[in-house]
């Protein structure tokens, strides 16, 4: 089941560059590697992800580094801060492929500028787990999901505005 908004997005962006084309755009900077080591430990390494080269015309697969995807997200963030042209990056990957690193590492970079990262997740248990893991790394994170009261949500949002929250997890209905 695909939501019509997702279908519309895919149709609108069908001529966007595919992940397999990122290889030519950016190289992984040492500062990005340093962030990986800081938050994932001194033995951490970027893994390779298998992606379709061009899913519109076939199922040929190539491998791309998590680091290159992270670097691309960081560069797109920098482009947006300078009001330069940006592009979307769309990724689907199975459980265990390393998707959390793909948005968390750029978010650590973004947080150095005082900006916040908003993550939309339909799974409350996953959100709670992600928040707990981030807090264990010394990163301020909160989650807002169904079943929370208005006052509790207002307090959490105030913490985003006036506190030092770096990650805000939201369930789609919020």
Regions found by a protein language model. Give the residues of each.
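N-terminal helicase ATP-binding lobe
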Residues: 1-174
